[in-house]
């Protein structure tokens, strides 16, 4: 039995593949979770756009961890489905729905699979790959941005929920950003020039790091320090036009009303 067990969704290309190649654990058993088999790594076939396949991963993870006697088990949610770029009214409705399944719901559902299966006796950790899109308001990437915001909030909330539960993993969302992956290349090649931020996105893409560099920086940042559930590898945008809230938020301060935090 391997001392380290690592699941990586989307380990077939980009950051996911480089995370597999650069794992710092020499004896690690790498398991790719993807729509297709990888020639070099064990694979579990799961289609993020099809929720009926997600329980295949649940059964696999439960079986592996129920008898796990190694030192650590890690799960990296990295996969991304890029079939619905574009302005909302121009994207095919079925593609848009698939993107919501794949990029918003699936990361949380697959994360839940791992968390629920983890037990005491070994270190466990869940890494949710986020993006600068979590803090950047980029037209044409609505499901992508929504998914990254969801990942970051979910990681922080479930981290707090599991703090008093023995045998549960540490959690961290890693906001990489600035990485020239295959989906980014595709986005740049197919971007509608009439989109408000098209020129900015194209210019930004040419200044990005390679997936190999990004993967190396991610591994350097893990595991996170105690109490940390979000790691960012780059600052957010300075341009107010690319920021959430800012001038788009009106704070009415209605007397007697307050948000309930606890």
Regions found by a protein language model. Name each.
Residues 125-150, 155-164, 175-179:
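Catalytic loop of short-chain dehydrogenase/reductase
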Residues 173, 189-258:
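C-terminal helical subdomain
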Residues 12, 17-20:
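N-terminal Rossmann NAD(P)H-binding glycine-rich loop of SDR-like oxidoreductase domains
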Residues 39-52:
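Rossmann-fold cofactor-recognition segment
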Residues 55, 71, 80-97, 116, ...:
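Conserved mid-core segment of classical short-chain dehydrogenase/reductases
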Residues 89-108, 151:
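Catalytic Tyr-X3-Lys loop
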Residues 100-107, 139, 147, 207:
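Short alpha-helix in the Rossmann-fold core of NAD(P)-dependent oxidoreductases
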Residues 9, 70-81, 103, 128:
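Rossmann-fold scaffold of SDR-type NAD(P)-dependent oxidoreductases
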């Amino acid at each position: 039995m391997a001392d380290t067990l690592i699941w990586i969704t989307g380990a077939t290309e980009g950051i996911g593949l480089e995370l597999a190649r650069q794992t710092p654990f020499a004896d690690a058993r790498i398991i790719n979770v993807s729509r297709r088999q990888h020639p070099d790594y064990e694979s579990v076939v799961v289609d993020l756009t099809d929720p009926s396949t997600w329980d295949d991963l649940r059964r696999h993870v439960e079986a592996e961890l129920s008898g796990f006697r190694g030192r650590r088990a890690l799960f990296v949610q990295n996969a991304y489905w890029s079939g619905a770029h574009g302005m909302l009214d121009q994207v095919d409705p079925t593609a848009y729905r698939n993107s919501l399944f794949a990029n918003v719901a699936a990361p949380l559902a697959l994360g839940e699979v791992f968390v629920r299966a983890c037990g005491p006796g070994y270190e466990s950790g869940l890494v949710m790959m986020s993006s600068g899109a979590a803090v950047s308001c980029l037209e044409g990437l609505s499901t992508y941005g929504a998914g990254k915001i969801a990942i970051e909030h979910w990681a922080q909330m479930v981290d707090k929920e599991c703090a008093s539960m023995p045998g549960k993993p540490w959690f961290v969302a890693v906001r990489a950003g600035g990485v020239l992956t295959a989906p980014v290349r595709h986005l740049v090649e197919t971007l509608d020039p009439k989109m408000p931020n098209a020129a900015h996105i194209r210019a930004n893409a040419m200044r990005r790091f390679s997936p190999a560099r990004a993967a190396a920086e991610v591994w350097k940042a893990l595991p996170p320090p105690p109490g940390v559930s979000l790691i960012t590898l780059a600052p957010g945008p300075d341009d107010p036009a690319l920021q959430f809230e800012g001038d788009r938020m009106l704070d009415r301060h209605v007397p007697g009303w307050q948000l309930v935090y606890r």
